From Swiss-Prot:
Catalytic activity, EC: 2.7.4.3
Gene field: adkA
Family affiliation: Belongs to the archaeal adenylate kinase family.
Alphabetically ordered keywords of this record: ATP-binding, Cytoplasm, Kinase, Nucleotide-binding, Transferase
Organism: Pyrococcus abyssi (strain GE5 / Orsay)
Protein name: Adenylate kinase
The UniProt record lists the keyword Phosphoprotein: no
One Gene Ontology molecular-function label: adenylate kinase activity
Organism classification: Archaea, Methanobacteriati, Methanobacteriota, Thermococci, Thermococcales
């Protein structure tokens, strides 16, 4: 018995805010895990890096080993309590887009749901421009839409290898944050009967 919900969305879509508010309202006691944070902790323990920025420079084989180690750890945790896994479906690199969760990792995690938070490119661009605390790449609306399209494609690939259901939650300025939060709470509350 395990219940894993992967939540993803490109920077500026409102994923962190929606996640935080949904966790306050759900009946299930989820453990929120950021996949990248856990990978970084493992890399520091192994003496591979000192700073988060060094992670991208590790050889691909070492990164894959870290991903598998973290996936196994999360899979074990999910036997005790439901997991909400915050991660990137795709990662924009200077050379192209990288899948955030390779085949072996998604098979190990075996998620129940893959939730994608989306908004219009103009909304995302506006949020990024207003959020001066974050150092984000400047992208055009077309590039933002391409990234969201690739996230959907990645989610389909992940679902094919895990039988997860895909849920797309739209976080539009006019729709309201409240509706997006309620949609996520509905998904999270499904975990209650799994751990009863």
């Amino acid at each position: 018995m395990s219940f894993v919900v992967i939540i993803t969305g490109i920077p500026g879509v409102g994923k962190s805010t929606i996640t935080r508010l949904a966790l306050q309202r759900t009946k299930a006691k989820f453990k929120l895990i950021n996949f990248g944070d856990l990978m970084f902790e493992e890399a520091v323990k192994a003496g591979l890096v000192n700073h988060r920025d060094e992670m991208r420079k590790l050889p691909l084989e070492i990164q894959r080993d870290l991903q598998m180690k973290v996936a196994k750890k999360i899979s074990e945790m999910a036997r005790q309590q439901p997991i909400l896994l915050d991660t990137h479906a795709t990662i924009k690199t200077p050379h192209g887009y990288l899948l955030g969760l390779p085949y072996e990792v998604i098979k190990t995690l075996n998620p129940n749901f893959i939730v994608i938070i989306e908004a219009t490119p103009s909304e995302i661009l506006g949020r990024r421009l207003r959020d001066l605390k974050r150092d984000r790449d400047v992208e055009t609306e077309e590039q933002i839409q391409r990234h969201q399209d690739l996230n959907r494609a990645a989610a389909i690939a992940y679902a094919m290898h895990s039988n997860a259901l895909i849920k797309i939650i739209e976080n539009h300025e006019d729709k309201g944050l409240e509706e997006a939060v309620n949609e996520l709470v509905e998904i999270l509350d499904l975990a209650v009967k799994e751990y009863a």
